[in-house]
Amino acid sequence: VALRSAKLAKKNPREIAQIIVDHLPENDLVQSVEIAGPGFINIRLKPTALQSVVAAVRAEKGDFGKGEIPEGERKINLEYISANPTGPMHAGHGRWAALGDATARVMRHAGYDVYEEFYINDHGTQMDNFGESVAVRYQQLLGRDVEMPEACYAGAYVKDIAQAIIDEDGDKWLDADPTERMENFRERAYAYELAEQHRVTERFGTTFDCWFSERSLYEPDENGESAVDRSLAAMDEKGYIYVEDGATWFKSSAFGDEKDRVLIKANGEMTYFMSDVAYHYNKMERGFDHLINIWGADHHGYIARCEAMLAAWGWPGALEIMLGQLVNLFRDGEAVRMSKRTGEMITFEELIDEVGVDATRYLMLAKSSDQPIDFDIEVAKKKDASNPVYYVQYAHARICSILGKAASEADAAAAESGELSMDELAAKVIPADVDLAPLAHESELALMRKMDDFGPLVAQAARDRAAFRLTHYAQDLAALFHSFYTNCHVIGEEAALRDARPALGDAARIVL
């Protein structure tokens, strides 16, 4: 504060800092206030102020650090992953899954009302191409000499779907009408891939409030109008639709876009952007006040036109885009692009299979979404401090081991039964009225200070859409616990600390 005010006040920063210190009210929780360096103000709290954090964490447990809905924030729609249902999700989708899910969790903990949505891109020629791809593989597997068209999908998974159809229907479709066959295979292949997306995201611990089908945007409601119709009418009513050379255009340049955008081509075909327009209008129709989309950085060029459409309807600023950079996979420092099993791009699930859900989640959140991630598969599997995931997990496991050992000394039969949760074990070890006053070692104070930072950190991470800060925080908290464990005897200490130190460890476990 002093440094920022110096230029405006035309005073030396230390002089301003002294004025601030002289006017600070007395506070029983403050141990000392010092001016340091060019004008920093260091406020050191008394141990009793920090000790109350331990009691708060242990009392509130999973609710510790929760906030209330920030003023002005209401219902938020968070859309992420939204992978095409034409093939397996790749490792990059794993980053969007981790980022979207963590962002939603952090925002909810901070008090925001967040609704998670997966947009299913199930409309357009890509779906027909998918159906045709399966039809070609189906014929090839049954001995027909048929070439795969250039626009089709050639992955091994297409062959698997075709084989599943053969197992179910045999050669029933071999001489069927090509269009009928393609449409049948398209729907079956679509259902298969959509089910796979559900299964893999659920395995990853990511659940959506809604899986929204792009097709539904073109389906009429009880009044005979589709979301496409309604979104166009709303834009036209505002005067931002015009027809030129037979095509229907959106006057997006009126809102800062570099040029106007075609919504309906002269031949009557809807553009991909038309779906975007209808989809975002539909979101606002459903009562959302703020929209957050997580996109890959390659979609950067779509931001201006999408912001323009919300502004055209009278909702400027309602759309927020989080852009995510690429995931670069490595194995022992060497770039990896292909799966050993399939010879194709490594899928999201293959990554989970190899390193686990926890490691994948954590490492995908190791950096801000606007920075590329170098994900080393071998490092993610290591059981040492070089693996940040293991380092944090080891701190948690260490605490659980301490509580388990202490519980065994208190009630061996109950502790060894395996029926008690960690909260129940902790309750057996630590008295409800535990005296925390003896916690005064610098390692203990540092650990408590870090736990006290949790609530404000969650609020900041939610506000800035910066879930990655929580992985950094977990790393720091784990390091402070390891230091505390090294410098302070947790079990077998004198009576004054026998209960207090396990209580501190238990609080660190809950926050971790």
Residue ranges and their predicted role:
Residues 1-51, 58-512:
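Non-catalytic interaction-recognition regions
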